[in-house]
């Protein structure tokens, strides 16, 4: 079996983490695997390119730049295709799995991707198409994240915000949504198998394209994180006031980090110590420690290991790996109500809470937080969580899925 993983980024973001981990685990088990990614920062080669075997940067910088510039007007990516991979794929001996992840974000023209898949399937029938949906892009006219909007259910008539990712100047989603959905139907007709790590994304997809069209395989922590976990000593009790973590790539974005909630935690003063991990922190106070964006996973996990809890208030994530990672090292997660957080926490027996409850819980000790959220002791919660988010289990489910197609 030959597997090609496709994702817009190589090592940035949750979808990239899943795709890259599947690629590395497949290689480790002796399967033939390559990872094709769109571009790195600024349209250049990813800074992580040399760190991984069998990876291919796909998109010329000018193509990405043109898509970025024109998307704000057209609401779709005008350029980008897989045509140069046609000969490589069709001349490969034996079955080939083309496993797509995030194909949007200024990378590829969707219609060109569908036409490419048609051409490849006609030439080489033993090509299997798999697409993991890491967001809601497959059901909307434009947006990757719904952020509470349900306009996609009625054809994206009028977008409530032009700033929702990916942002635009002119709203054309209502003009594009029918054609976009037709292209997904054509992928289904080609036998493409759709998967999502999240039940709520799968439910949205199935409501449009038919019952059972999208199946569930939950995300798991990656190999690098598993190696780090093996070396981290469990921290049962911390000294002093509760240490509370807030983690996001860009801490200014209210969709990922509820700004008002963080300020209310800051207002608790010397009752807690608030630690932020991410770029552009707007939070400054005597009880706040801003660590900045930590690219070294080992350093981030080591720092989180010292925390009493992680507060998660995102409205735009679908199956956030940071929750799996924090829970796997025995750090309780205090999450506000969202489909994504509810789904992840339920896997280890946890629950989401209201914003008012967050402000009470962050003042408790680590064992008390574990008891309140997970209904058990800190030791039992840690053991349960370590088993719940296994990356090896994720790979086994995917490989089993590939082989059964």
Curated annotation (Swiss-Prot):
Keyword field contains Transmembrane helix: no
Q: Which Pfam families match?
A: Glyco_trans_1_4, Glyco_transf_4
What pathway does the annotation place this protein in? Slime biogenesis; slime polysaccharide biosynthesis
Task: List the Gene Ontology MF annotations in alphabetical order.
Answer: UDP-galactosyltransferase activity
RNA-binding listed as a keyword:
no
Keywords attached to this Swiss-Prot or TrEMBL record, sorted alphabetically, are:
Lipopolysaccharide biosynthesis, Transferase
GO biological process per UniProt? colanic acid biosynthetic process; lipopolysaccharide biosynthetic process; slime layer polysaccharide biosynthetic process
Q: Which Gene3D superfamilies match?
A: Glycogen Phosphorylase B
The name under which this protein is listed is: Putative colanic acid biosynthesis glycosyl transferase WcaC
Tell me the organism's taxonomic lineage.
Bacteria, Pseudomonadati, Pseudomonadota, Gammaproteobacteria, Enterobacterales
């Amino acid at each position: 079996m030959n597997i090609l993983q496709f994702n817009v980024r190589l090592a940035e973001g949750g979808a990239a983490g899943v795709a890259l981990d599947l690629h590395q685990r497949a290689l480790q088990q002796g399967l033939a695997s390559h990872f094709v990614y769109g571009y790195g920062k600024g349209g250049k080669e990813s800074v992580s390119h040399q760190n991984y075997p069998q990876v291919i940067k796909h998109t010329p910088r000018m193509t990405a730049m043109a898509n970025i510039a024109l998307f704000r007007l057209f609401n779709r990516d005008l350029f980008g295709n897989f045509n140069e991979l046609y000969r490589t794929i069709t001349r490969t001996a034996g079955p080939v799995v083309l496993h797509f992840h995030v194909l949007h974000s200024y990378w590829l023209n969707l219609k060109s991707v569908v036409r490419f898949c048609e051409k490849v399937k006609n030439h080489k029938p033993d090509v299997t198409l798999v697409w993991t949906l890491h967001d809601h892009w497959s059901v909307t006219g434009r947006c990757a994240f719904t952020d509470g909007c349900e306009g996609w259910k009625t054809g994206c008539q009028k977008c409530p915000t032009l700033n929702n990712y990916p942002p635009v100047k002119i709203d054309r989603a209502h003009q594009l949504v029918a054609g976009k959905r037709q292209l997904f139907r054509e992928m289904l007709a080609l036998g493409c198998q759709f998967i999502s790590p999240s039940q709520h994304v799968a439910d949205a997809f199935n409501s449009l394209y038919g019952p059972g069209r999208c199946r569930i395989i939950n995300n798991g922590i990656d190999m690098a994180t598993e190696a780090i976990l093996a070396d981290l000593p469990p921290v049962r009790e911390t000294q002093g006031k509760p240490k509370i973590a807030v983690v996001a790539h860009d801490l200014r974005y209210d969709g990922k980090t509820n700004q008002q909630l963080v300020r209310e935690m800051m207002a608790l003063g010397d009752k807690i110590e608030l630690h932020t991990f991410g770029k552009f922190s707007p939070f400054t106070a005597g009880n706040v420690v801003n660590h900045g964006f930590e690219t070294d996973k080992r350093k981030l996990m080591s720092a989180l290991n010292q925390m009493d809890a992680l507060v998660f208030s995102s409205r735009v994530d679908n199956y956030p790996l940071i929750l799996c990672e924090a829970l796997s090292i025995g750090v309780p997660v205090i999450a506000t109500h969202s489909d994504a957080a509810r789904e992840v926490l339920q896997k280890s027996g946890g629950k989401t809470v209201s914003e008012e409850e967050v402000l009470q819980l962050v003042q408790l000790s680590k064992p008390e937080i574990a008891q309140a959220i997970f209904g058990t002791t800190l030791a039992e919660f840690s053991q349960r969580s370590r088993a719940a988010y296994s990356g090896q289990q994720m790979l086994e489910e995917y490989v089993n899925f590939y082989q059964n197609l």
